[in-house]
Amino acid sequence: MLNGIVVVNKPRGVTSSDCVYKLRKILQIRKIGHAGTLDPEVNGVLPIAIGQATKLIELMHEKPKSYIGSGMFGKATDSYDLDGTTTAEEKIVTPFTSDEIISGMKKLTGKIDQVPPIYSAVRVNGKRLYEYARENIPVERPKRKVNIYSYELTQDPEYDPLEKTESFNFAIRCSKGTYVRSLVNDLGEELGVPAVMTSLTRTSSSGFDLSQAVDLETIEKEIDYPEKWLQPIDSFFVDLPQLQISPDQFKRVSNGASIKLNTTYAKVALVYNGHIKAIYQRQGKIYRPEMMLLKNE
């Protein structure tokens, strides 16, 4: 049985669930799930856990995500991207300088309260926001605390003198739960003009980046060579201290027993026969199991 993480390079025009469904059919595997939904028109890194790696999904969500994208000043939509209905338009007579845009981005960096787009999957009273939007039912969107580690302008903005709009490119590194569409909309609000996101690519997620991503067609062609497209479970724990355990210790670990270890780390990955078999956490003078990965081969 395969165990590991497939870093899929999701194309535009398909949902994250579509990718999971297609990969399930290709691999003929039932234990499978993705970590972090991408909107249909967003492409890039979509980590999909299979086999024992599905135990990691919650941990995978906790790691920062990175994006590159583009936006435009002069127009706003109800979805904060080009799929939505236009809600505001304003001719940009005097284009913003790079410094002005960077200043606005800095105000949106750090720990902030973010309001999600009305067209999003956030639940309010058991119902998703996009369902309220489609039914034209007013609803208060809850603010959510997110961490924007960096929000950067990646090149000088471009002004269109005919359309009187201004386009800009950005790079963002952020915590889970962040809506990049909202950050583009909020940047417009900081500068006092409508703004809309025009494209977005996720460049990293769950500790994996685009250089490790493969498309589903490649996986289908290379189905017999998983080493070409499957990231081992151990690769997810590269930042965690690892400790080799003896056969006797492994017997105890296999039974979920607490053990004493010659280390003081708060959390440690236990390795046996070259693979991580469990994650143990220190409690007082002993270590107790936090996650069992006994089938990780």
From Swiss-Prot:
Documented EC number(s): 5.4.99.25
GO BP annotation list: mRNA pseudouridine synthesis; tRNA pseudouridine synthesis
UniProt xrefs under CDD domains: PseudoU_synth_EcTruB
Keywords: Isomerase, tRNA processing
Superkingdom in the source lineage: Bacteria
Pfam families assigned to the protein according to its UniProt record, in alphabetical order: TruB_C_2, TruB_N
Entry annotation: catalytic residues: 39 (nucleophile)
Annotated catalysed reactions: uridine(55) in tRNA = pseudouridine(55) in tRNA
GO terms assigned for molecular function: RNA binding; tRNA pseudouridine(55) synthase activity
Function per UniProt: Responsible for synthesis of pseudouridine from uracil-55 in the psi GC loop of transfer RNAs.
Homology family: Belongs to the pseudouridine synthase TruB family. Type 1 subfamily.
HAMAP family: TruB_bact
PANTHER family with a match to the protein in the record: PSEUDOURIDYLATE SYNTHASE TRUB1, TRNA-PSEUDOURIDINE SYNTHASE
Name this polypeptide is given: tRNA pseudouridine synthase B
Lineage: Bacteria, Bacillati, Bacillota, Bacilli, Lactobacillales
